[in-house]
């Protein structure tokens, strides 16, 4: 515990929180070849690899993921939500933050229904989260 004198001299340092999705916090300037801190809610990227991985211990499945090279040249692993997808290598995707609890190292989600990613077809509930159009009556 600090003394009163130490607190007067130095004071308390406020804790800076760490970002849970750090790749969304930078923009790459290709002219100056430098990264600038400029946080954004989503980022565009190109899928470099699409595959499946198995979740952590109590769960069992084949979760779909894509390795994405973002527009700021950072490469991240993103989860593909929903049943079925049309992604392949070189597909242009939009990612958002949000981790998948049982996949280590997956801190981002791919947004369905934008750019090259098709929405989930046959989806009736929570359609906006999966890019599904309203069904015809």
From Swiss-Prot:
This chain's source organism reads Limosilactobacillus fermentum (strain NBRC 3956 / LMG 18251)
A biological process from GO: translation
Q: Name one GO molecular function term.
A: tRNA binding
Task: Outline the segment boundaries, as ranges, of region: Disordered.
Answer: 1-22, 37-57
Question: What is this protein called in UniProt?
Answer: Small ribosomal subunit protein uS12
Cite the HAMAP family for this sequence.
Ribosomal_uS12_B
CDD domains given in the database record: Ribosomal_S12
Q: How does it assemble?
A: Part of the 30S ribosomal subunit. Contacts proteins S8 and S17. May interact with IF1 in the 30S initiation complex.
* Similarity comment text for this entry: Belongs to the universal ribosomal protein uS12 family.
What keywords tag this UniProt record? Answer: Methylation, Ribonucleoprotein, Ribosomal protein, RNA-binding, rRNA-binding, tRNA-binding
Summarize the protein's role: With S4 and S5 plays an important role in translational accuracy. Interacts with and stabilizes bases of the 16S rRNA that are involved in tRNA selection in the A site and with the mRNA backbone. Located at the interface of the 30S and 50S subunits, it traverses the body of the 30S subunit contacting proteins on the other side and probably holding the rRNA structure together. The combined cluster of proteins S8, S12 and S17 appears to hold together the shoulder and platform of the 30S subunit.
Q: Report which residue ranges the record marks as coiled coil.
A: none
- Modification 3-methylthioaspartic acid occurs at: 102
Q: Where is the composition biased (Basic residues)?
A: 9-19
Q: Which Gene Ontology cellular component terms are annotated? A: small ribosomal subunit
In terms of Pfam families, this protein maps to: Ribosom_S12_S23
